[in-house]
Amino acid sequence: MHYSPKKDGARSHGLPYDPFKSSAVPRPIGWISTVSADGKHNLAPYSQYQNLTWDPPMVMFVANQSVLDNGKSRKDTVRNIEETGWFVWNMATYDLREAVNRSAKALPYGEDEFEFAGVTKASCLEAPGARVAESPINFEIEFVQSLHIPTGNPVSTFDLIIGRVAHVHIKDEFILDDGKIDILSIKPLARLGYYDYTYVDKMLSLIHI
């Protein structure tokens, strides 16, 4: 099959679900925690998250407009980041899958997703918000830039957030004797298309020729 999102629109594939989302897989989950200037905590997963560079370590994620008002306002996460200059990435894992899923629910402004998801707040070294204590790895990230990108569709306009990693927290029990992270024990969760997810339970190594 072939379809042209540029010519005929993103939904011109004629399938019941979007094949694009199921082709760009697996995607790391941006489980992002923030706090507002007046101290209201927020936690939400974003399925379009990725690292940009490793030296200095920088990351990015995309947030669509809020679904609570038909896409007319920006997400609480984005507003909090621009207000405080910080956000935290928390590694989503298989064991935390239910908490990740619960934190995806769009709650009214000011309701605490940490409490709703049933996870614990841990203090940060520099970021004003909290990190997920149960997560094996957390990044404290300093806000660098946001790009508000129009798409021509009023309900799919999005914000691209770029940040620089200032602090990395790793639970000691997940560092192997050879200094590598024990990924197979962590079982990182990743996003697929539809309502599907996967997690890392197999690895292979390829030496560059």
What are these regions (language model features)?
Residues 1-207:
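Basic, polyanion-binding surface patches
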